[in-house]
């Protein structure tokens, strides 16, 4: 059904007032999903229009979009989308800052430790001495990534593990906000064999210190880039310091479409939201800004790759992972981050007079307010 925006608003105002333990009836679920489809179709149409304006837009086997240098496109992303997946390794349970877009916002003091001397790989805990056993039994991944909070809180613990995976010839990339990085620690990571480092430049609001650390990292690590959620704050801060950032000669910029969970969604209260394939909930402006960013990069011929790490990309990522794991046709772990749909977060976009559905039809008989039997 092509529900009208007016009818969708009436229903979602009702849904947002329901007690948390009250489940919608089948016909109400149809209305909910019809509304999500209408919003998503309008967002997809806008994105298609923006992409049509990027002259040299490229794809990686239709799994993601990027502009710029093919050689500088991050191999960590190739592994994630074409290889064995992200293959996350976790160690640190602390961070030196708190970002409003962080998935752990508000709970940073309550993150459980991995364990003294231990590393979490594939949801299993290992001592460093166990890694040789792991490599001798399991098929080697195409790449691994050091994720979760801030590794430079205890970066000295990482060097020997990085060296071990480097000796095994496995591609490795690491995420950091870059604030605590030093020339000494970046050099040590490079000497240990880290292939790629990604700075969340948005976390520091594009601070001069982190920009300088990006430049230093280029001296020691093969591939250096930025990966940060695309927000209006990052977009503005980046272009205020664009030349200084590009002068670091970084290799890539991954613009992640911001998606929200129960920890951080209140930080974006009142923003226009959409839900992608009944999964990730995102502000509508995040990918819009990414595509505008990519258009500028393409027109100005920046000597790097700019990658659109969108909800579409993450959907493709999870399909690739399930196929590599030998799961059934269509299997994927992609899904919603919320245990219950937060209907109220869709009220702003339904109330926005400037946001239009592409096609609207009258509700069928039996679906109009007052016609459903409770």
Regions found by a protein language model. Name each.
Residues 2-12, 305-374:
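Accessory C-terminal segments flanking Radical SAM cores
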Residues 186-202, 242-255, 327-350:
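Structural recognition of alpha->loop->beta junctions
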Residues 65-66, 73-90, 94, 100-101, ...:
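Conserved alpha-helical substructure of the radical SAM core
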Residues 211-317, 332-341:
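Conserved C-terminal portion of the radical SAM core fold
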Residues 106-126, 137-154, 166-181, 189-209, ...:
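Core AdoMet radical
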Residues 155-162, 182-190, 209-213, 238-241, ...:
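Distinct, well-ordered alpha-helical segments
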Residues 52-56, 83-86, 100-109, 117, ...:
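Mobile, glycine- and charge-enriched loop segments
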Residues 1-88, 97, 363, 373-374:
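Flexible, acidic/Gly-rich N-terminal and inter-domain linker regions that tether
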């Amino acid at each position: 059904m092509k529900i009208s925006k007016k009818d969708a608003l009436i229903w979602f105002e009702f849904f947002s007032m329901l007690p948390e333990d009250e489940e919608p009836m089948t016909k109400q679920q149809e209305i909910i999903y019809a509304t999500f489809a209408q919003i998503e179709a309008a967002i997809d149409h806008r994105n298609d229009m923006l992409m049509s304006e990027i002259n040299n837009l490229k794809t990686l086997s239709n799994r993601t979009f990027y502009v710029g240098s093919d050689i500088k496109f991050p191999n960590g992303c190739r592994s994630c989308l074409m290889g064995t997946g992200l293959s996350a390794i976790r160690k640190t349970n602390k961070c030196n800052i708190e970002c409003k877009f962080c998935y752990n916002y508000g709970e940073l003091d309550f993150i459980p430790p991995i364990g003294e001397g231990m590393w979490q790989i594939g949801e299993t805990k290992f001592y460093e001495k166990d890694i040789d056993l792991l490599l001798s039994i399991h098929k080697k991944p195409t790449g691994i990534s050091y994720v979760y909070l801030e590794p430079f809180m205890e970066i000295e613990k990482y060097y020997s593990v990085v060296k071990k995976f480097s000796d095994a010839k496995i591609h490795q990339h690491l995420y950091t906000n870059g604030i605590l990085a030093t020339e000494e620690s970046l050099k040590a990571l490079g000497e240990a064999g880290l292939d790629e480092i990604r700075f969340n430049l948005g976390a520091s609001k594009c601070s001069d210190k982190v920009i300088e650390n990006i430049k230093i990292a280029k001296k020691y690590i093969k591939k250096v880039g930025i990966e940060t959620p695309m927000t209006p704050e990052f977009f503005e801060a980046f272009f205020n310091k664009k030349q200084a950032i590009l002068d670091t000669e970084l290799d890539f910029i991954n613009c992640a479409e911001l998606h929200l969970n129960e920890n951080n969604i209140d930080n974006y209260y009142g923003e226009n939201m959409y839900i992608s394939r009944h999964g990730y909930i995102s502000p509508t402006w995040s990918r819009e800004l990414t595509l505008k960013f990519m258009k500028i990069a393409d027109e100005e011929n920046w000597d790097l790759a700019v990658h659109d790490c969108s909800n579409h990309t993450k959907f493709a990522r999870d399909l690739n992972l399930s196929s590599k794991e030998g799961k059934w046709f269509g299997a994927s772990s992609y899904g919603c981050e919320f245990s219950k749909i937060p209907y109220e977060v869709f009220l702003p976009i339904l109330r926005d007079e400037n946001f239009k559905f592409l096609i609207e039809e009258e509700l069928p008989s039996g679906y109009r307010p007052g016609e459903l039997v409770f």
